[in-house]
Amino acid sequence: MAASIGALKSSPSSNNCINERRNDSTRAVSSRNLSFSSSHLAGDKLMPVSSLRSQGVRFNVRRSPMIVSPKAVSDSQNSQTCLDPDASRSVLGIILGGGAGTRLYPLTKKRAKPAVPLGANYRLIDIPVSNCLNSNISKIYVLTQFNSASLNRHLSRAYASNMGGYKNEGFVEVLAAQQSPENPDWFQGTADAVRQYLWLFEEHTVLEYLILAGDHLYRMDYEKFIQAHRETDADITVAALPMDEKRATAFGLMKIDEEGRIIEFAEKPQGEQLQAMKVDTTILGLDDKRAKEMPFIASMGIYVISKDVMLNLLRDKFPGANDFGSEVIPGATSLGMRVQAYLYDGYWEDIGTIEAFYNANLGITKKPVPDFSFYDRSAPIYTQPRYLPPSKMLDADVTDSVIGEGCVIKNCKIHHSVVGLRSCISEGAIIEDSLLMGADYYETDADRKLLAAKGSVPIGIGKNCHIKRAIIDKNARIGDNVKIINKDNVQEAARETDGYFIKSGIVTVIKDALIPSGIII
């Protein structure tokens, strides 16, 4: 069953961190400047690092030329991060909902990209939000522009309004694009979206902004990311992936010096330019063997930016810049700011295309270890509690598959597939290598009889259907004896009036579509 946000509690390790901070009498900076949680300090403000520096305050931190990768640290059960001040009070999470999602169309026809269903029970937005909550970051904004109704509804139902406890300091809130006298245009890019809401973000008494994408699949401890940012005294820290030469041409690459400081950027380089972007990734924590296999580092589009630096860059230095990755971050480097790389050496997938989305979902069925696991008790993925009954399987043959809650599966075969919430699959059906997103609601027996009397089709998969290498969006009505197998091996096709698209050879049936009985696709 998907984890509910109501179950989120402080871990013993986080309490230990708090106790250590309270008992630490050797800190260079007094608690009056950095903490406002104690009752006798109520009303004190968290001072930006730049302000403290200007007052002559020295930070007792060690600058290290090596940034240890999350793979080497966060995978250890004994590793512990003690941020001071802690992330819940000093970091604001900003999740970018993305653009129109044209490459994910038709899945984004009626929903924002972060609202696309994932892994039977979840939505894409649950990934960055859960990573934040598991990293003790409870102040989270989600910026959206397109089709945000279902995303808004999901977030309001999934994440309680009082996540910060009795002080009510935590929240997950959607900020939709809006027009104003100061900003008459819609969001023009990632940086512009953040700029248009700077007036709101700067009201929060924090040290850093954590900028995240809403369409990535990965599990990351952001506290270690933020700790590296502070330890290296960085203005900006960029999460980076190690890359081999084959994949590197599809990403924005970075070059670093011996301290892990970013000195050069290249967007999807080829040939000699690609070879020039090779770096010694042992600097970031890879062993010699992995470093030879992965001589490039690519930006993940995830940033920690100090608050005063963000305000300065977006308002003063680059008031017309629209994008973080191609304009603001390289611009900060050119200004001489300290822009650090932080290596993330775990599973990460950009869910930007139908093929990537399909592979990411089917990857959770992989044996013996899935590409991404929803079963990690130390860092669960939260979502909306739906209170559905257990799935019912009647004489069904199910292998290497993931089945969501509330499904009714009758005398059929399902292999290497993901079956979403409330899916109804009738007798004789064969489902292979496919993703079924399920339904938003159940139809009553009376509804189904009425549809049958009218010659229409109920929600779900009809009798004796064969579905292979396909995505069936929510509330689709697939009649009896339908074959969705891409019999002609078509790679690209737009058949919206017929209820489906084909992209990269994957048939995608549109949400609420009707595929009549006997149709062969």
Curated annotation (Swiss-Prot):
Record: residues binding substrate: K268
Organism (species): Solanum tuberosum
UniProt-annotated stretches for the region Allosteric regulation: 444-454
PANTHER family: GLUCOSE-1-PHOSPHATE ADENYLYLTRANSFERASE LARGE SUBUNIT 1, CHLOROPLASTIC-RELATED (PTHR43523:SF12), GLUCOSE-1-PHOSPHATE ADENYLYLTRANSFERASE-RELATED (PTHR43523)
CDD domains: ADP_Glucose_PP, LbH_G1P_AT_C
A GO CC term attached to the entry: chloroplast
Top-level taxonomy: Eukaryota, Viridiplantae, Streptophyta, Embryophyta, Tracheophyta
The keyword ATP-binding is annotated on this UniProt entry: yes
Protein name (Swiss-Prot/TrEMBL): Glucose-1-phosphate adenylyltransferase small subunit, chloroplastic/amyloplastic
